[in-house]
Every structure is written in C-alpha cells, then in structure tokens.
Design a protein with these regions (language model features):
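Active-site entrance/lid segments in N-terminal catalytic domains of soluble metabolic enzymes
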Residues: 1-231, 400-419
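Conserved active-site-proximal phosphate/metal-binding subdomains
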Residues: 20, 202-217, 221, 225-238, ...
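Residue-level detector of alpha-helix initiation sites
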Residues: 28, 243-244
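A structural signal for short, well-ordered beta-strand segments and their strand-loop junctions
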Residues: 45, 144, 238-239, 261
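Short, surface-exposed recognition loops or helix-turn segments adjacent to catalytic cores
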Residues: 153, 239-240
Length: 420
C-alpha cells in the first residue's frame, strides 16, 4: 500500500517530501513551525499578516506603538483615509520576520511566506509590492499568493533580481481563477512554480461563497489538472483543505497532485503560534462548534469556532494601530458596522457588533479561532490527560504521521508521563 513518502515534490532537480504546511496568520504558522517542517524535508510557511505586529512580538520592535502615536489624534474619527503605513517600516518588519526565520532554517526543506492580497492597508498596490520585495530581499525560498486573484502581483516584482529564482505560486479554488491569472501574466513569460488548489473544507478565509458545501476538493483538483494538461503546462498542483490523514494525502498524490497542503493538525503542535489555552479549545471542539460565517471585513466567508471571543465584540476600530484591512479609500466594513451600532444605541458604553468583526485586533489577540472543517477530529489524534486537557503534539509527530501512515490510520503518540 502506497504512502506519502513514496512520492516527492520536484522543483527542477530539487526533491522534497510532498507535505506543505499552510500559511496561517496572525503568526499561527510561525517561524518555529516553519523551521521544523523545513528540517523534516517539507515546505513550511510563515505568514506576513500584520507583519509589524509579529515583528514587535517576536523581535522587540515597536512599529505598532509608533504608528498609533503618529495617528492618535484620529482615533475618535470615522474617517481613516489619512491613516497610512510607512513603507519603510513595512520593509523593515518583513526583513526582520523573513530574515530571522531564514537564518534559523536547517535541513533540506524550504520556507515560503504566505502573502494575502486582501491585506489592502490603505494603499493596496504599494504595500503589497513592499511586502513581496522585502521577502525576496530577505532570502525567502518562495512566496504563496493568497486571498485574492493577484492578477497584478507578478508585475509588481518583475524587475526584482530574484523574480525568476524564488519559487512563486498562487492559491486558487477553481480552474477559472487560475486561467485568469495565467492570461494576465502571459506577457511576463514567467509561469507560477506551483498552484495550490484550496477546497471548501479549509480553515480561515475561503475562496467560495456561502454555497461552499456544494463543492469538493477532489473534483476541483481534477479540473485544474485537466486544464493544465489541455494548455500543455507542467505546473505542480498542491491539493489543500480537509486533508486530515496520510491516506487522504496519498489519494490526492495518486490522483496527480504533486503535494498536499495541510494545516489543521499542526494548530495543536508545540511549535504552533497559538496560545496553549486556544489549542485546548481546538481539541475540545465538536463538529457543531464550527461554522462558516461572513464576519470578515474582507468579504470572504470564514470558518471558525463559534465560541471565538471576538464574535460579537463591539470594540472601537483600531486602525490607527493596525488598519491592515483598510481599502484604497480608507474604508473597512467593520468600521461601518460599528458606527451603525453606535448610532442605534446612543449613550451606550458598549455595543455588540454581530455583522462583522474587527479582524485585526482579534486575530492579533488570538480571539478569532479560525479552523479547518475537521478540527473536531483533533481529539482523536492524541491523549486526554488526567486533568481533562489534551496532550500537545510535536510538529515532527504530525508530519511523520502524514508521511508514513496508511489505511486511514493516525498514529497516536505515547502518552506523556506525569512528573512527580
């Protein structure tokens, strides 16, 4: 019986274990996790979501404090059009985040950074160019373009000396989205090095409408592979979303995928950036505790735990400190939803905002618990301890279970021994 380790992801002469850990922000798929996955021979991701916040937390910088200080007089205003990021500070934060991660890298694997187009930051084109360029400057192995069509993203970095050297790929949820990307970038004569096909069971933002349940990953992967074949294009396809066991992964590799991208099972590893108390919430979750909603100001549906503390929280918008989802006109759907509730409840000290959430603040504080569809199965991958909590796993344990397991089985690690 075949297993994941019987396959290899090939980039030219380079061969890797065909396991990619998806990019999860804010700092959930963190440097520690990415470095460990690279050591094991796969591809780890870091995320550039709220990179200045991540830099402050990990590297003792003070970008957020300085931005808030600069725009503090604007805090009470609903008009955020004048609140801008310093491109120089974005670049510096990216160099910290990417550079330090790459310095720590060991082993034969690779480390990519996940870049969301929907992080519009009140200057979509300039801030995205800065993030992409800084990542390349800092030595990242590859970039995965996510949360958007990215029709112009290659063009932003076409003059960079590493444009044809670094591995560049895109996440799509349909052959149509891929076709649009390829047509738009045909003039550059630079194909993506890989395509991640993300299905409807993925965690966080989804590339589907609220009819997501009508789609399935296997069908979309087959359609994308067929499309590439019809266009005589040899681009590795990476299947993602709802791949919970090594046998699940092997099925996609046998179907023709070059690799799989997984994430949910790594959220409860010791290396993952989530606080341990949140990891326990993931373990405890039942299938009924998980929902897909429209709370994200990005406009994309989002999968999360219903018990996320950020749901319904009516905090004042924190755009002066954060503001990563401000569009090109300084607007954000949460600001509108918040202002509407304030108007409805004049004089109230607190309001509840149920339509949208202040994603920047709550993701920074780990109060929106984004998750994959199969999060409710995590409790079956480990042991419950005497105190009722669940034993955390190591990234190596989870990675190697994907790599070597067969017959739909999950190798539960040995129970931890209590220290007297």
């Amino acid at each position: 019986m075949r297993r994941v380790d019987d396959f290899r992801l090939r980039f030219g002469k380079r061969e890797l274990v065909p396991i990619v850990i998806g990019g999860m922000g804010v700092d959930i798929s963190n440097a520690d996790l990415a470095v460990e996955v690279a050591r094991l021979g796969g591809i780890g991701h870091i995320s550039d979501a709220m990179v200045q916040t991540v830099s402050d937390r990990r590297y003792d910088t003070n970008f957020v404090k300085q931005k808030l200080k600069k725009y503090k007089a604007n805090v009470a205003s609903s008009d955020k059009s004048g609140v801008h990021f310093s491109l120089g500070e974005i670049e510096e934060a990216m160099r910290h985040h990417v550079g330090r991660t790459m310095e720590a890298k060991r082993g034969e694997g690779m480390i990519f950074v996940n870049c969301m187009e929907k992080l519009t930051m009140n200057a979509p084109r300039d801030t995205l160019r800065t993030r992409l360029t800084a990542a390349l400057d800092a030595g990242i192995d590859g970039i995965t373009l996510s949360a958007g069509l990215h029709l112009n993203s290659f063009g932003l970095i076409e003059d960079h000396p590493r444009f044809r050297d670094a591995k560049l790929g895109i996440i799509v949820s349909s052959p149509r989205a891929l076709a649009m990307f390829l047509r738009k970038n045909a003039r550059l004569q630079r194909l993506p090095d890989f395509v991640v096909v993300e299905g409807p069971l993925a965690g966080g933002h989804l590339g589907f409408g609220m009819d997501w349940a009508q789609y399935d990953l296997a069908t979309i992967v087959a359609e994308v592979i067929a499309y590439l074949k019809s266009e005589h294009l040899d681009i590795p396809v990476i299947a993602a979303g709802g791949i919970f066991t090594g046998s699940d992964a092997t099925g996609f590799l046998e179907q023709g995928a070059a690799a799989v991208q997984v994430a949910t099972r790594f959220t409860v590893t010791q290396e993952c950036g989530l606080p341990d108390k949140v990891k326990q919430e993931y373990f405890r979750a039942s299938e009924e505790d998980i929902e897909v909603n429209t709370l994200s100001p990005t406009g994309y549906p989002m999968r999360m735990l219903k018990g996320s503390p950020g749901i319904g929280s009516g905090i004042r918008p924190n755009c002066e400190a954060y503001g990563y989802l401000l569009d090109a006109n300084g607007r954000c759907a949460y600001i509108d939803a918040y202002n509407l509730e304030v108007e409805r409840h004049p004089g109230a000290k607190k309001v509840k905002v149920m339509d949208k959430t202040c994603l920047c603040t709550h993701m920074r504080n780990f109060d929106i618990w984004t998750c994959g569809h199969y999060t409710y199965r995590l409790k079956d991958t480990t042991h419950r301890l005497d105190d009722g909590s669940y034993q955390l796993l190591s990234a190596e344990q989870v990675f190697q279970d994907y790599q070597f397991s067969t017959e739909g089985k999950i190798a539960v690690p040995a129970a931890a021994v209590a220290v007297a």
